């Protein structure tokens, strides 16, 4: 267990020795959400798949278990959300989707995040999942992702992401940078 603000790539390296999957159970408040958002890319870079546990309406695991019991907590663990889809849900909170302009910006940012998957099959799986959850036509989202990738100069198999300091990082299929 780590505190969210203290989670590092070294922690992820230790975890990787024991598992390829983790469930993040940070507090459900703003600080906990930020901690999860910081931990997700660190875990991803270490090759660890993460899911995020929804504690609501309670603040933390202790409060949840005291009020709902261990069986309910186990159910929540089984329902933990894929970390990328969690990131999209959090991103969505920044937009007023009733406004067409805001909705378009949300879809553009979502498409940009989908570019982090260089493997075409994985990217396609996430396009399908996001289109289902966010109620956007799959083909329209795919076209938006492809168009954005072309504008950024990505080739098939390349991936794009922002690093922890906000810099754009392009990973080429052969493992080299831009």
Language-model-derived ranges and their functions:
Residues 1-4:
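Short hydrophobic/aromatic-enriched beta-strand-loop microsegments
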Residues 6-178:
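A charged alpha-helical hairpin associated with nucleic-acid processing machineries
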